[in-house]
């Protein structure tokens, strides 16, 4: 892409911003060729009558920018107009037209319609395996709550029918759950299954396993998972956290201390499952569902976890700095 005078502005020696450093790292670690190959068969080709589509690489980059910076379609369009760094990452020159919010929306719907978000997570993980990242040892399962708007002040005067409320501790939440299965050693997400918030964690355990693990770790919400019918053929050992009441019921102090040490060990292994949640919620700002319905939000969450995997191992993937 040829530089214009607008593009050349600010290319002199100056401090690199955190945004520029982050995007430079993502430029190197995202498997662009594999992702573009997944989407290309479904993306409209140029040369037909009418307005020509934007380059697929540009639209994919804009879509990923939306996930990293938690931007809506209108906000993404405005950010491309205002922020030179984002425009440069999207490969839009100073004289190029910026995709409007409807074009950005249509690209996201194309990914949702063809179920490409799940395949993007698979493509990212396959690329990480090729680069030496483990994704086939033990699995840790857990779920996080994602809030949804509980107000009925909208056109339908109703809440999203696919979202439900649940109680955690003494607090009530309305929204959905995002259960995930992560690798025991690397902490990378390999399976995601979004559900309504009121569905018990243990009911989707089978959907979070890849089938080759030798151990499964989970908190007390997964008690009895190994006895469920859909997991009878699973040969992995289940290491589920004991409930506090079970530990307190042990009368012998020595046995109780031994059981507590065992629980501490299991908790230290399970800690890795919290890292992807931190990345998507704190690093990428995903604290509330953006769309109505589980299908659209599941596609969004799948993309976020694919990007969180890349973010967590970016240091190992980047070339060594001298």
Language-model features: where?
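Charged, often Cys/His-bearing segments associated with DNA-binding zinc-finger transcription factors
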Residues: 1-33, 37, 319-322
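Secondary-structure capping and boundary motifs in well-ordered enzyme cores
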Residues: 31, 51-58, 96-100, 265, ...
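Alpha-helical support elements that line or immediately flank enzyme active sites
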Residues: 58-70
């Amino acid at each position: 892409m040829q530089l214009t005078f607008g593009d050349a502005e600010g290319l002199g020696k100056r401090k690199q911003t955190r945004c520029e450093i982050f995007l430079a790292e993502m430029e190197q670690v995202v498997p662009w060729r594999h992702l573009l190959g997944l989407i290309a068969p479904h993306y409209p080709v140029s040369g037909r009558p009418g307005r020509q589509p934007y380059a697929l690489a540009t639209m994919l980059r804009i879509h990923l920018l939306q996930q990293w910076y938690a931007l809506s379609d209108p906000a993404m369009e405005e950010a491309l107009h205002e922020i030179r760094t984002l425009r440069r990452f999207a490969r839009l020159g100073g004289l190029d037209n910026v995709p409007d919010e409807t074009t950005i929306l249509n690209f996201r719907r194309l990914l949702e319609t063809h179920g490409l978000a799940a395949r993007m997570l698979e493509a990212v993980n396959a690329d990480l395996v090729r680069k030496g990242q483990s994704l086939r040892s033990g699995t840790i399962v857990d779920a996080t709550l994602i809030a949804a708007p509980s107000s009925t002040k909208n056109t339908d005067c109703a809440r999203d029918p696919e979202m439900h409320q649940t109680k955690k501790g003494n607090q009530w939440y309305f929204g959905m759950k995002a259960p995930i299965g992560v690798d025991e050693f690397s902490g990378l997400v390999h399976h995601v299954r979004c559900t309504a918030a009121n569905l018990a964690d243990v009911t989707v355990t089978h959907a979070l396993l890849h089938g080759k693990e030798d151990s499964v770790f989970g908190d007390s919400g997964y008690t009895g998972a190994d006895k469920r019918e859909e997991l009878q053929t699973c040969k992995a050992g289940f290491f589920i956290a004991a409930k506090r009441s079970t530990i307190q019921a042990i009368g012998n102090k020595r046995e109780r201390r031994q059981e507590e040490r065992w629980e501490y060990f299991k908790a230290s292994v399970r800690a890795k499952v919290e890292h992807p949640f931190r990345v998507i919620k704190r690093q990428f700002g995903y604290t509330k569902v953006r769309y109505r319905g589980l299908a659209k939000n599941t596609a969004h969450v799948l993309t976020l976890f694919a990007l969180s995997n890349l973010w967590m191992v970016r240091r190992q993937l980047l070339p060594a700095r001298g």
